[in-house]
Amino acid sequence: AQSKNFIEDKEAGLVSEVAQGGTNFSGGQRQRLAIARALANDPKILISDESTSALDPKTTKQILALLQDLNQKLGLTIVLITHEMQIVKDIANRVAVMQDGRLIEEGSVLEIFSDPKQPLTQDFISTATGIDEAMVKIEKQEIVEHLSENSILVQLKYAGASTDEPLLNELYKHYQVTANILYGNIEILDGTPVGELVVVLSGEKAALAGAQEAIRQAGVQLKVLKGGQ
C-alpha cells in the first residue's frame, strides 16, 4: 500500500500517457515508469542497472532524486549498478567494486573515496576527483619542474574532523615550513567533508620531516610525489 501511494504521487502525470500506450515517452519518463512498475509488488530491494546512462544531466538528477525518495520514504534498499562515479557520490551509502565478475572491494562511500585499496578502485576514484587531470598540469608548473632541494611536493587527503583544522598554518607556526597550494578539492560524501590537496612544502630538512609526521598525526594521509630524497 505504501508503494502504491508513492506511485500515485510520483506517476500521476504519466497516467494519461500510459492509457494512450506511452508512445511519446522520453527517456526519463520510461525510467520513472519502469520504477513504478517495479514497485507494484512492494519489493524490499530495487535493482537499478545503469538506469541513468542514456539520460541528460537534468533528467539524471530527477531520477536520482526519485530513487533517494524511495530509499528514505519507503525504506527500500536500492542496488544501483553504474560506472558513473559521480552518481555513486551523489546517492550511495555503501559501495561494492566488481572486476571480471568478482567483488574486489567494498565499504562505505567515505571509506572507498578517501582510502581506496585496489588499483581499479584507485583508478576510478582518481578519475572521479579529477586529480589525474590536475596532476598533468601541476607537473608542468615551473615550481614543480625545478623543485628546490629544500622543498617536497605532497598529496594530502583528509576527511571528517581533520578538515576543520588549520593544518598548513600550524606547520609554519611550529616548524617554519611554508605551504604553496597547487590544487585543492573538497566534497561532502554521505554527510562528511572529504578534501584533497597537492602542496609544495618548503623548509629545512629536519623541519620537513617533523611537518610530515605532524600531518600524519593529525589523521591526514600524506604521499610524497616529488623531492625529499
Model-derived regions, located:
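A short, surface-exposed alpha-helical micro-motif characterized by mixed small hydrophobic
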Residues: 88-90
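Catalytic Walker B motif of ABC-type/P-loop ATPase nucleotide-binding domains
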Residues: 46-49
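ABC ATPase nucleotide-binding domain "signature" region
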Residues: 33-38, 62
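ABC ATPase "signature
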Residues: 106-107, 115
